Amino acid sequence: YRNWLAQDDTLSELLELINRQLTEKGLKIEKASAAVVDATIIQTAGSKQRQAIEVDEEGQVSGQTTPSKDSDARWIKKNGLYKLGYKQHTRTDAEGYIEKLHITPANAHECKHLPPLLEGLPKGTTVYADKGYDSAENRQHLEEHQLLDGIMRKACRNRPLSETQTKRNR
């Protein structure tokens, strides 16, 4: 059903309908001044891991494993465990109401999937996101669309975060 909902904007239309009803009932603020972006792993149905699994850079399994029912799902290693599935990138308003979803294979990196989540945000909205969305391209996109930068900073190799950046991330 996830694939069916993601096709032809059905999921977007459903979220729009739910948010409109919440606004009409006075349960949701029409225009929030902040947007929160995050990603979560959605595991697909499959057999439990019974052997060590080796995965290449594209999330394809090298070696023999039990075949999955879902050929679009990809493997990702999280907290030392391999998971087969998708990554759901979500934009919520400041109150936590979901406004937009974007689904990718689990091995897709967050930083390349921020712009689709920001479509339709009014100018001046602060966008908060974790370090996975930290990139020069995303900061430029925010600037071009006159959105305020609330993305956490990520330390680079041999360049730790400054004290100011560390405090800002909290």
List PLM regions with ranges.
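Short gly/pro/ser/thr-enriched loop/turn and capping motifs at secondary-structure boundaries
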Residues: 156-160
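Polybasic low-complexity intrinsically disordered regions
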Residues: 1-154
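Active-site-proximal loop->helix
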Residues: 163-165
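Short amphipathic alpha-helical "interface-anchor" segments enriched in bulky aromatics
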Residues: 41, 167-170
